[in-house]
C-alpha cells in the first residue's frame, strides 16, 4: 500500500500547486495540456471520447506522441480522465452491464495508452433497487477491466449525490466496492471525493467539516483519496440533487473550500474544478482557481 494515493498519481514535491480543472479535449486530447496551461494549471481532467455516446475511438500513435509532448511542454504533473455518462456497471440489465464493462475497459485502455494517472467513474445505478447486488456488479466490472488493461492508470470511484437509484452516495458503498475488487487489482483503486455530491448526499462540509473527513478516514482511509472535485452546489444540503455551481455562489459557500485548500492532510491530493463556465469560458476557471489560491495568502 502506498503512503497516499496521490503518490500513485505521480504528484511530487516539485508541484506544490495541486489545483486544476476539467478542460476541453475538442480537436483531440493532445490540445488539453495547452488548455490547462491557459488557466495556469498543472493538473487536468478530460474526456477521451464524447461522454454521451457509445462509440469508442482509438488513440493512434501520432495522438499519443503529441499528447505526451504537450504534457511535457506544459509541465502537467497530473492528468486524468472522466468516463462516459452512459456507463452503468451497477445495472441489473445483463446487456447494458456488458456494454458498460466493455466501454469502461475501452476507456481504461485509452487512458493507459496516454499514460494518464487516473480514470474517474460514477458507480452507476441499481435500477432494480437491489443495491447490494449493484455494488457487487460494479466491483466485478471494474475488476474485469483492470485485469484486461495493464498500465499506470488508477481507477477512482466517485462519491455520488444519491439521486434516484444511484449507488456510491455513502462512504460505506464505496468501501464495499473497493473490498469487492480482486486482490490483484485493488491497489489500483481509490476514491474521488466530490464536494457538491458529498453535500447533497448528506455529508455536511459546512457545519461539520472535521466529522466528514473523520468518517472518510475511518470507513475508507485517507490513503485511498486520489482526487477532489471542487464544486459548489446549486441545491440544499442532503437534497440528493447533483447540480454544480461556481465556488462561493452556491449553498456550500467559500468556507469548506478554504478549509480543504489549507488542510495539510489534503495538501498533495489533486483538486479539479468542474464548475460552470457559462459565457466566460476559461475565464471562469481562472477566477475560481484564483479564489482557491487566494486562501493560501490569507
Task: Specify the residue positions occupied by each region the protein language model found.
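Histidine-acidic metal/acid-base catalytic patches
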Residues: 2, 8, 175-298
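N-terminal pre-domain/capping segments
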Residues: 2-83, 87, 91-106, 298
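Active-site acidic/histidine proton-transfer and metal-coordination neighborhood
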Residues: 4, 89-190
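Residue-level marker for buried hydrophobic side chains located in beta-strands
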Residues: 19, 79, 155, 191-192, ...
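Active-site beta-loop-alpha junctions enriched in small/polar residues
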Residues: 22-26, 49-51, 83-86, 124-126, ...
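Acidic (Asp/Glu)-rich catalytic clusters
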Residues: 34-40, 60-80, 107-115, 144-151, ...
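Conserved, mostly hydrophobic/aromatic
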Residues: 36, 82, 100, 111, ...
Amino acid at each position: 500500500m502506498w503512503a497516499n494515493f496521490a503518490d500513485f498519481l505521480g504528484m511530487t514535491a516539485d508541484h506544490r500547486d495541486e489545483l486544476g480543472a476539467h478542460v476541453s479535449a475538442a480537436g483531440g486530447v493532445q490540445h488539453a495540456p495547452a488548455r490547462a496551461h491557459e488557466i495556469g494549471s498543472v493538473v487536468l481532467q478530460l474526456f477521451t471520447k464524447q461522454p454521451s455516446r457509445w462509440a469508442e475511438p482509438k488513440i493512434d500513435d501520432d495522438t499519443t506522441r503529441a499528447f505526451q509532448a504537450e504534457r511535457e511542454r506544459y509541465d502537467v504533473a497530473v492528468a486524468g480522465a472522466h468516463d462516459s455518462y452512459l456507463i452503468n456497471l451497477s445495472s441489473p440489465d445483463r446487456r447494458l452491464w456488458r456494454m458498460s464493462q466493455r466501454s469502461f475497459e475501452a476507456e481504461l485502455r485509452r487512458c493507459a495508452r496516454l499514460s494518464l494517472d487516473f480514470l474517474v467513474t460514477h458507480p452507476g445505478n441499481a435500477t432494480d433497487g437491489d443495491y447490494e447486488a449493484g455494488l457487487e456488479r460494479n466491483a466485478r466490472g471494474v475488476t474485469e477491466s483492470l485485469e484486461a488493461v495493464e498500465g499506470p492508470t488508477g481507477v477512482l470511484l466517485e462519491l455520488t449525490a444519491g439521486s434516484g437509484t444511484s449507488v456510491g452516495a455513502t462512504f460505506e458503498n464505496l468501501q464495499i466496492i473497493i473490498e469487492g475488487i480482486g486482490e490483484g487489482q485493488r491497489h489500483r483503486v481509490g476514491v474521488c471525493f466530490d464536494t457538491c455530491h458529498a453535500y447533497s448526499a448528506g455529508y455536511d462540509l459546512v457545519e461539520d467539516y472535521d466529522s466528514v473527513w473523520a468518517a472518510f478516514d475511518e470507513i475508507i482511509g485517507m490513503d485511498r483519496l486520489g482526487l477532489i472535485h471542487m464544486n459548489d452546489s446549486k441545491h440544499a444540503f442532503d437534497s440528493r440533487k447533483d447540480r454544480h455551481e461556481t465556488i462561493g455562489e452556491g449553498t456550500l459557500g467559500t468556507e469548506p473550500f478554504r478549509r480543504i485548500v489549507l488542510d495539510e492532510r489534503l495538501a498533495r491530493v489533486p483538486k479539479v474544478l468542474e464548475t460552470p463556465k457559462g459565457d466566460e469560458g476559461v475565464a471562469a476557471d481562472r477566477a475560481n482557481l484564483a479564489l482557491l489560491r487566494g486562501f493560501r495568502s490569507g
